[in-house]
Structure formats: C-alpha cells, structure tokens
C-alpha cells in the first residue's frame, strides 16, 4: 500500500477533474438505485466511525525540499545543542581583524603630501608605496646620512695611513689604535643614520618620505588629501589583510566564569545565518563604558565571509547544569496542529518531530524531549517549511 510520503502531490487541475467525475458518478448512482432504507443509512453512518477507530495513527509526513530551495528561501539548519537555556548566552559582537592582519599606516615625518599612488579599495602588496610626503625632515635625515658616510671615509683613510706608518716604525702603536677606534665610531654613526633614513622611508634624493604598506591586502580607510600637511605618526591609510578574522563578543563580568576557552559558539549574522565558532579566549577584566568583558571567538570555517567591522551576535554555549538538557533557537520551534514541533533534516527534506518545550529566554528554547543532541533541525525561516507542510496536507485532503 502506498504511504502518504510516497504519493505525488496532485495538482489543483487534477483535483478539480477528479472531484467533478466523482460528483457525476454519485448523481447517476443515486437516480438508478433510489434512496437507501433507514437501516442502510444507519449502517453507512456507522462505517466511517468504525474505520476511523480501527485506523492506526498517521506517521508524520516528510516535506521534500531540494537543497537549492533552502538557499533561495534562506532556511538555516543547525544541530540541536546539548545544554539548557541557562547554558546559552546571546551576546552582541563585532568582527575584528586578527592581530597582524591589519595595519595602520602613518607618515614617519611631517610635511605636505606630494603624491598619492593608491586609493581606497585598491589591492596592495607588502612594500608598495601608497603616498609620498615632501618633508624637510627627509632632507635633514639624508644630509645626516651623507655627513656620517663622509666622516667614515675620512676615518678609514686616517686609519690606513696610521697603520702604514706604524708598520714602518714611524709612529707608535697608540696612534694607530686611536685611528682604529675613530673608524669604528664613524662606521657606527653611518649605520645609525642609514637605519633612521631607512625606517622613515627617505627617498634616494632626500626630498620626500614614502608611505609604505607593511602587509599585503586591501586599503580599507584613507584619510589623506593631496597637498595637505600631515604630522608625524598621523594615520593616513588602513590596510586589511586577506587572512582570518575573529569575532569579539561582549559579556558581563558575572558571565565570564561560565565561559571557557575551547567551548562551542555560534556566530549569528545580521541576516540570521549561523556560523560555527569556537571560543579562543576570555579576557579576565572588563573595560569600556559598558563595563563588559571580551570573549574572542574564531570561526571554524576560515572562509566564513565575515567582514571586519560587521555587527553580529554570538550564542555562547556554557556548561549545562543538566546533562540531559537540550536547546535550539526559538525560531526552530513551530506549532503544527496544536503541538510544538521541530523540523528534522532528512536526505530529501524535513520531517516534523513533536518536542516538549521548557523555558524560553534570549531567543533560545529549551527542549526537554523529542530530539537528540546533534540532530540537524531547521532554525531560521522554519515557518516556511511549516507552510509547505500545511499546503501538502491541504492538497491531500
């Protein structure tokens, strides 16, 4: 016998045609056979009741939904979490760059912006020149470098002469050693001046200072104008690398003791899409006007698509007081025919499962029974599956 799940859902034109044919057959039979007797009427009325009493309870229907529809309808699927409502914290968070993957780029000397070679949104490589600053300090550093080099050349010639005279027995050893010490000092001064000029990115002609990106990435901020005067260490560009990002969630000081590094977390995007994450660290102190502690969460998927500065939410899973408790996002629980259900993912779609719901708090519902931890259930936009199931049930009727 073909079950409900195996039947193809008929189209509305087919249903209308079948209904019309049944009406004609019934009308002809009524005319040909006449009205039934009273005993027959009683027997016919009792037959449906007897059939209904003997029929077994219908199994939950499965709604067949292709994977392409899930993406188009923005339906999210998440595992049932182990732990009750009290073991889940919903905290505001923001996406930040991992230390070392973002650079604030400033001018090393004061001056006027001579040239801008990169603009906002451009991709850059490590060592690329973003701008040139015409600076008197650059000329001073270049001159100091040349003076130090000239003194070193003079000290080298003096040492060579004193060394030759000492070997000929003309001058004592003390004068040769003094010349050698003077040469060492001059060479150290050359190295110092060259290091200062190199750190400031002084050009070869000594007229300008180059603003250079230390990392590869993309320019995400630009606060420089051609011809404008800039002060030393003033931010001109900001470059974000293409590396991993982290999510910084903010919790109260009382909640920090409930969160441990390595515990599971769920990152909830602005559109409701969930991303699996893991707690990397919890700051032991609070800071800021909100007096909140920071919980650092890293996405499990390195290619998560998170953008630095994006606002998100994080569900932090703490240790549950009841080992048998479970929880799901509140959107996952739907009311179907007067009962609370969740839609469990199957190979071809979803199947409703009746659940016993406990408390609800912070967008999370506690599940007392009906499912097992780890089962994949529909969360965001689960009501669309309910609508499809109601539609399928109406078509079957």
UniProtKB/Swiss-Prot annotation:
It comes from the Bacteria. GO terms for biological process: copper ion export; plasma membrane copper ion transport; response to cadmium ion. This is Nickel-cobalt-cadmium resistance protein NccB. NCBIfam families: 8a0102 (TIGR00999), RND_mfp (TIGR01730). Component of the NCC cation efflux system that confers resistance to nickel, cobalt and cadmium. One of its GO terms (cellular component) is plasma membrane. Residues 137-195 form a coiled coil. Belongs to the membrane fusion protein (MFP) (TC 8.A.1) family. SUPFAM superfamilies: HlyD-like secretion proteins (SSF111369). InterPro entries: Co/Zn/Cd_resistance_CzcB-like, CusB_D23, MFP_Cation_Efflux, RND_pump_MFP. The chain crosses the membrane at residues 10-30. It is found in: Cell inner membrane. Keywords: Cadmium, Cadmium resistance, Cell inner membrane, Cell membrane, Cobalt, Coiled coil, Membrane, Nickel, Plasmid, Transmembrane, Transmembrane helix, Transport. GO terms for molecular function: metal ion transmembrane transporter activity. It is a single-pass membrane protein.
């Amino acid at each position: 016998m073909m079950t409900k799940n195996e039947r193809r859902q008929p189209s509305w034109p087919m249903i209308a045609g079948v209904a019309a044919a049944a009406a004609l057959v019934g009308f002809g039979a009524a005319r040909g056979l006449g009205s039934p007797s009273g005993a027959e009427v009683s027997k016919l009325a009792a037959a449906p009741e007897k059939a209904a009493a003997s029929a077994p309870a219908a199994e939950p229907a499965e709604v067949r939904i292709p994977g392409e529809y899930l993406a188009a309808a923005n339906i999210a699927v998440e595992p049932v979490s182990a732990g009750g409502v009290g073991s889940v914290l919903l905290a505001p968070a923001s996406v930040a760059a991992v230390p070392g993957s973002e650079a604030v780029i400033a001018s090393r000397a004061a001056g006027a912006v001579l040239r801008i070679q990169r603009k906002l949104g451009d991709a850059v490589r490590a060592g690329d020149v973003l701008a040139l600053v015409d600076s008197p300090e650059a000329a001073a550093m270049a001159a100091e470098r040349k003076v130090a080099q000239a003194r070193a050349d003079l000290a080298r010639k003096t040492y060579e002469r004193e060394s030759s005279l000492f070997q000929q027995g003309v001058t004592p050893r003390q004068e040769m050693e003094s010349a050698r010490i003077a040469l060492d000092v001059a060479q150290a001064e050359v190295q110092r001046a060259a290091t200062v000029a190199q750190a400031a990115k002084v050009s070869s002609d000594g007229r300008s200072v180059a603003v250079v990106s230390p990392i590869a990435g993309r320019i995400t901020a630009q606060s420089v104008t051609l011809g404008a005067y800039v002060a030393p260490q003033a931010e001109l560009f900001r470059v974000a690398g293409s590396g991993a990002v982290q999510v910084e969630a903010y919790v109260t000081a009382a909640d920090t003791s409930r969160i441990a590094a390595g515990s599971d977390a769920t990152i909830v995007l602005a559109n409701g899409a969930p991303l699996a994450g893991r707690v990397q660290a919890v700051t032991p102190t609070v800071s800021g006007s909100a007096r909140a502690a920071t919980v650092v969460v890293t996405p499990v998927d390195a290619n998560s698509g998170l953008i630095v500065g994006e606002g998100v939410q994080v569900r932090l899973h703490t240790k549950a007081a009841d080992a048998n408790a479970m929880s799901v996002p509140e959107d996952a629980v739907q009311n179907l025919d007067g009962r609370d259900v969740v839609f469990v993912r199957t190979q071809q779609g979803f199947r409703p499962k009746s659940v016993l719901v406990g408390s609800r708090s912070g967008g999370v519902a506690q599940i007392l029974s009906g499912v097992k931890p780890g089962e994949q259930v529909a969360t965001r936009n689960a009501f669309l599956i309910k609508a499809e199931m109601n539609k399928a049930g109406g078509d079957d009727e």
